[in-house]
Regions:
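Beta-strand-dominated extracellular/periplasmic modules and repeats
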Residues: 1-190
Length: 190
């Protein structure tokens, strides 16, 4: 493994990927599926919210199909849904995405993965990106998801589950990310 130096922390460095155009609005009026908002904050090891974090997500559409050439499923594609978004944290250190609840996707060995969102976190001072997942608290399929069940400690497993709520008549899932310390979010090697 190559060694990192302090000046080689993870980006974001390239302005082309950091336009002022909102990249967190993933669900349009005609996007198929249940419209949801995913929001939260990112905390450091001392429990302080971090102000300058970039959160990227990618997910399947409501049918459980990714908008990617390698997804060869017979499920429909939704032309109004790319399945990808990016959000920087705001003045109150919140990130948010307006999206849809994804459908279940195939796993390895003929298993089915519960609806989930894949997440990549980039922040000042991090030497590598951190990857995690968001599962949904109201999904029965979580009980048999092979990735979620690979986290043997149930307390740690809960760090991957967003809590369903409602705000202004809309469905909101709250998912806080803890980079270190008590209740550190489970991260995956990618």
């Amino acid at each position: 493994m190559r060694k990192q130096t302090p000046s080689q922390t993870v980006g974001p460095f390239y302005a082309i990927g950091l336009t002022r155009k909102p990249m967190n609005l993933m669900a349009m009026e005609s996007t198929q599926g249940e419209r949801i908002r995913v929001e939260g904050r990112v905390f450091d090891g001392d429990g302080a919210a971090i102000p300058d974090v970039m959160v990227e997500i990618w997910q399947a559409n409501a049918y459980g199909r990714y908008n990617h050439p390698d997804d060869k499923q017979e499920k429909p594609l939704d032309p109004m849904f790319t399945g990808w978004g990016r959000s920087g944290t705001d003045e109150q250190c919140f990130y948010s995405f307006e999206t849809i609840k994804p459908g279940p996707v195939p796993g390895n060995d003929a298993t089915v993965q519960a609806p989930h969102v894949d997440v990549c976190i980039m922040a000042r001072g991090m030497l590598v990106h951190a990857f995690t997942r968001i599962y949904f608290s109201d999904e029965q399929a979580n009980e048999s998801d092979p990735v979620l069940l690979s986290v043997k400690n149930k307390k740690r497993r809960r760090t991957l589950v967003a809590t369903r709520g409602e705000k202004d008549g809309k469905v909101v899932y709250r998912f806080d990310i803890r980079l270190q310390g008590d209740n550190e979010t489970v991260f995956f090697d990618m």
